[in-house]
Amino acid sequence: MRIFFLCLLLVVGVDGGIFKDLIDKIKGSIKTKLQKDLNVTLNLYKKLKEYGSKVKNMLKLTPKMLKSLKEKLKKVRLIVRDKIAGDDGSIDEINEKSGVGEYLYQGDMILSEKQAEEILENIEEETSGGARNRTKRQAFKDSSYSRKLWSQGVTYFFDYGTTNDRLRVVAQDGCWSYVGKNGGEQSLSLGRGCEHVGVAVHELGHALGFFHTMSRYDRDAYITVIERNIKSGWRDQFTKESPQTNYNYGFGYDYGSVMHYGSHSAAMSRNLITMMPNDKNYLETLGSHILSFIDIFMMNEHYGCRKKCKPEFSAKCKNGGFPHPRNCSRCICPSGYGGALCNERPHGCGAELQATSNWQKLQDTLGFGREIREDFEFCNYWIKSPDHSQIEVKIVNPPKGVAVDGCYLAGVEIKTNRDQTHTGYRFCAKEDAGLTLTSHSNLVPVVTYNRIATTTVELEYRIGECRIL
């Protein structure tokens, strides 16, 4: 079977039409090195088009899933996304405008022959009911796993004599990368519109070995892909891994991952949802440009960094944190937590607030000027209540004019979610006004953030009516 799929990838020519147009977009000295892998990716694109009915069947919802989706859509807040001057949009939007997104795997990846071959095998097995014992990845972790790791680190400064294996950041059309180390100098493109930290982090995530979060084999337990809302020709961008090839290091599904596309990605029209989270309060969190705690934790697991800290000599981290591999006496903490052991409010602006039985106001303003900035400003608040009580947090006035997938320009993160290692619920749309969240404990971290103009958020909070037993 493996040889059969490899032949399929190699016999398809790329001598005309869209394939030639895309290859012609790649310029300069990197063209020769990219040619082979780009051909493989473009051939995969063509095969996926031929597999159209199979891909559509993969995305078809069972009656139970369809019923559940209808119930969720009745309750969800339909967000009208803002058009913001100076914002180039999400990666899939940037690459669509650049004319390359449809042809790259899942919109921004160039694949090796082995990776492309396994994707076709996944589709065959998913649609035929077969299964094979293949090596797992999530982070891409195939039989050549050790060769895909950057064992000596990544050379990210301009020193061409340091190592033969290195990343070369180029300004070609679109935002794209290889997945994992391919040997020698490999390119990562940050073209027009991609010059943002969050986009760069996403593409570096691919280069270091990560696929997209929404392609996890278990994604259907966390999001519903709405096939009818996906634009023509883009269904194959929503294929997923299989249990035989997908390894997630024991981490749960991360809605706030920088490797997750937005809930409106590849939609037929701007405000149609293509990915509906099972927890509807995560709708605006999908598509983040902020590196999540789980992203950091998983990358450290992938590269074995945590082994540097021996448990008996390392910090005893609280709230799900883990010892920093470069300073084992301190912890890397989930969002909303700080200090050496993750048991303090992060330093800087914000405050500790005490909830009572009456509604109290939290108003926060961040930012300056009118332009989009590279770096975020953050403020961290802790809302506390007595032991065994819960906290209610109401959004009174959300930020104005910044409603985009992932709330990647400004917003508020409210951590009423049960697992505090995961990203909290993020909000940035006017439709969020009036929404009330209830915590699972007597502490709610609230993180406000901004990197465009000035935004204000107003919340109210009080002790909830229910008590934790």
Model-derived features: positions:
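Acidic, Ser/Thr-rich intrinsically disordered and amphipathic helical segments
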Residues: 5, 68, 199-203, 254, ...
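Domain-level representation of secreted and single-pass membrane ectodomains enriched
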Residues: 308-469
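Long, disordered, Ser/Thr/Pro-rich
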Residues: 18, 22, 143-145, 267-282, ...
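Metzincin-family zinc-dependent endopeptidase catalytic domain
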Residues: 126-140, 148-149, 159-268, 376, ...
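Metalloprotease/metallohydrolase-associated module, dominated by Zn2+-dependent proteases
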Residues: 219-332, 338-340, 344-347
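Sec-dependent signal peptide recognition
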Residues: 1-7
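Divalent metal-coordination and catalytic microenvironments
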Residues: 156, 205, 259, 299, ...
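Disordered inhibitory propeptide/activation segment of secreted metzincin zinc metalloprotease zymogens
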Residues: 2, 13-161, 270-273
